[in-house]
Curated annotation (Swiss-Prot):
Listed name of the protein: Triosephosphate isomerase
Gene: tpiA
Pfam families: TIM (PF00121)
Phylogenetic placement of the source organism: Bacteria, Pseudomonadati, Bacteroidota, Cytophagia, Cytophagales
A GO CC term assigned to this protein in UniProt: cytosol
An annotated GO BP: glyceraldehyde-3-phosphate biosynthetic process
Species per Swiss-Prot/TrEMBL record: Amoebophilus asiaticus (strain 5a2)
Biological role: Involved in the gluconeogenesis. Catalyzes stereospecifically the conversion of dihydroxyacetone phosphate (DHAP) to D-glyceraldehyde-3-phosphate (G3P).
């Protein structure tokens, strides 16, 4: 049975001290109230990674992820951070393909595929984000849109490589808006994603892929979201920045 994955994307929030304090509070909670059925991954800003990594011990069931990395392992890329650098400070996961990276930095499926290769080459796990804008959903083209994102970003991977990928379905129109698809729509989309993978790979692999839902997840809807049989967890944004709300989410598992 897969654990429920709770991935917390802090985005560009919290200064160094604020981020470290929040991470300390979360680790103290996990030590006091172990969550046997959950896998918790924090995705703070780059400035927090090393400090938070020092809080992690075998007793603290908390994992560390980065919000981005470069597609090359090293070189003259001013301002960039490589997957190899992240691996050196105990980062285990890297977000890739998030809609904010696609929209604000013009990252396309080809670049995302290269980033995934770099992440895997450093023995890290990619958390691959896919999702459609509202205009695509309203024109009933969302299935084809998601299939193209997956095909161009993931289909070059071997089955063994694909098994290392976590997929996060985040409809763009639901991110930070308070809007959320119906439970039936979320369940339908996760099944669509699995069907896409079945056609390219095989049923066993597709059925065992970890698929998360992201987009306006919070304490009021977490129980319903994680009750969906095909959803293996959630990717949380704003709600993960507030200790009390995040703990409420964890206690709902």
């Amino acid at each position: 049975m897969q654990r429920t994955i709770i991935a917390a994307n802090w985005k560009m929030n919290k200064n160094f001290q604020e981020g470290l304090q929040l991470a300390k509070e979360i680790t103290q909670f996990i030590q006091a109230e172990p969550l046997a059925g959950a896998q918790i991954i924090l995705f703070p800003s780059f400035i927090h990674l090393e400090g938070i990594s020092k809080l992690l011990t075998p007793e603290v069931k908390l994992h560390l992820g980065a919000q981005n990395c470069h597609d090359q392992i090293a070189g003259a890329f001013t301002g960039e951070v490589s997957a190899a650098m992240l691996a050196s400070i105990d980062v285990r996961y890297v977000l890739v393909g998030h809609s904010e990276r696609r929209q604000n930095f013009a990252e396309d499926n080809d670049l995302i595929a290269k980033k995934i290769d770099a992440i895997l080459s450093c023995k890290l796990q990619p958390v691959f984000c896919c999702g459609e804008p509202l205009s695509v959903r309203e024109s009933n083209q969302h299935y084809a849109f998601i299939e193209q994102q997956i095909a161009e970003s993931l289909f070059h991977l071997t089955p063994d490589e694909l098994q290392q990928v976590i997929i996060a379905y985040e409809p763009i129109w639901a991110i930070g808006t308070g809007l959320i698809p119906s439970l039936a729509e979320i369940e339908e989309m996760q099944q669509t994603i699995r069907n896409i993978l079945k056609k390219q790979y095989n049923t066993v692999l597709a059925d065992n892929m970890a698929i998360l839902y992201g987009g306006s997840c919070n304490a009021s809807n977490i129980t319903k979201l994680i009750s969906l049989p095909g959803i293996n967890g959630v990717l949380i944004g704003g709600a993960s920045l507030h200790f009390k709300e995040f703990i409420h989410i964890l206690r709902s598992l």
